[in-house]
């Protein structure tokens, strides 16, 4: 890959969307942890995939120029010195359930008091797995975003049927002889959805998808879902680490130790403008309190992103059931998110349905 070329394109695109040069090029330190990393999404020999339809990979944490000691972090989280800090222990349960956890309050009280910014890459794994279908049948970029969102909703609504259809034809390596029958199967799923969904806008978008599928049957090739690695729905997740490194060469990036990721990055020389990048390092969470903060932050974010991956009406119905404590903590989360986004739009990076992104933004504006 020509990383220098991709860096230039990413930078130009960000500037065109209103990001300032200062925001893009600023020298600052970003700390990272990850959650729900299935390494890649593949069809296994037993004809199932290695991640659920709700899988949500988050690589992120906090941007901070000041750090805290291990003792300070234990105090902030209300823990005895020397006690292990793990979000998996302190934040068990769904998003609604962890709003009752003391660790939720303490984590974002700390982030807010320090004025650290939250940053993340959020990947809806099943969404990312199927975007190439739309990119192969639709040339209209703006329309494609909405078609990807409705396709994602349709395919995750019946995951076993989806795995059966896509697995049968070894997606994303659809052979020429199977192209029509694969598209027929996809069309049948969309028509079934149209027959059951009550929302007129959803029916309309799904109907447009049917039209695009039928038009694709006349194409000579489906560019992005043929002649690819069979049964590999999403390539290795190391790509998300690489993207952070080459997109923002002025940043100092500190990742939680991940031996496989570290090995793969070592094998891949990342150069921008003729210079090999050394703007990143790996640090053991057991000895780096900032990585431990990120562990708590990304754990909460992942649960929140799953919570908002549905219709806005369904989400609001649940929010209206929050008790006083839950609502106070939910507002705190949105306050931190909004402050971070206002400081720099680049703190948030979505590979996700536009519907989910819309939900997050609407709720952030209302509850921050």
Residue ranges and their predicted role:
Residues 1-368:
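Phosphate-ester processing/binding pockets and catalytic centers
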